[in-house]
Amino acid sequence: KFEANENYYKGEPSVKNIVFQIIENADTAILALQNGEVDAYQMTPQQVKKLDLDANNLTAYSYSEGRVGYLQFNCNRVTDENVRKALLFAMDKKAMDDAAYESDEYYSIPYTFLPTNSQFYTEEGVEKYDQDVDKAKSMLKDAGVSNLKLKLGYISSDPVQSAQALLIQEQLKEVGVEVELAGGDATAVSNAMKDPNNEYDMYLGGYIMGIDPDTFSSLFKNGAAYNYMHYSGYD
């Protein structure tokens, strides 16, 4: 139970108390919302779509949580930069996000490591890798790559990652790349990603890192905790 801070710098809050109730099962939590046992619940777009809001006298609000979902390459395994670029050109980001989030009402596409709602976000000078299948095929050919097989790690219980993994497999097949879907539980996948000798070629994941861009340096720094792509950046 949390009590409002009467001395909050923007003025006294209108809500005096908030109680957070831990409900581990999503279906149980949604039922509690429908029955009026809880006043609010954070839901996925898929859950909202299945729920009759009017019949249950509920209102859905969307907001930007500053989360960035990503596909990362394991640079220890996919070592050729041009191959990585070719794979990016093979993929349709909008189709992947539509499949995962139902509607662009629930997402925006960031073209950098910063979320689009960051005051520091910019696309100036950024290569966007919008889908170009012919270019992807040409780049793979120029790199001397054929019959490429890749393993994709993702959290199998995450509906967003599961939907995106299937589309990645389908889209890369169009350029002659075979993708093995290697879904697992969150702990196992996360631990494997940290291991520089892991067998994943690509990973799906996401992060909420706050508003200070310096925080994001841990994604690129050599040996940093969140440099899951094992990119040789800087010390």
Kindly give the residue locations of the regions a language model identified:
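Ligand-site clamp/hinge motif
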Residues: 5-51
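Structural transition elements
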Residues: 89, 105-142, 158-161
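Extracytoplasmic/peripheral linker and loop segments enriched in polar/acidic and small residues
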Residues: 180-189, 216-235
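Periplasmic-binding protein-like
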Residues: 51, 59-73, 78-118, 223-235
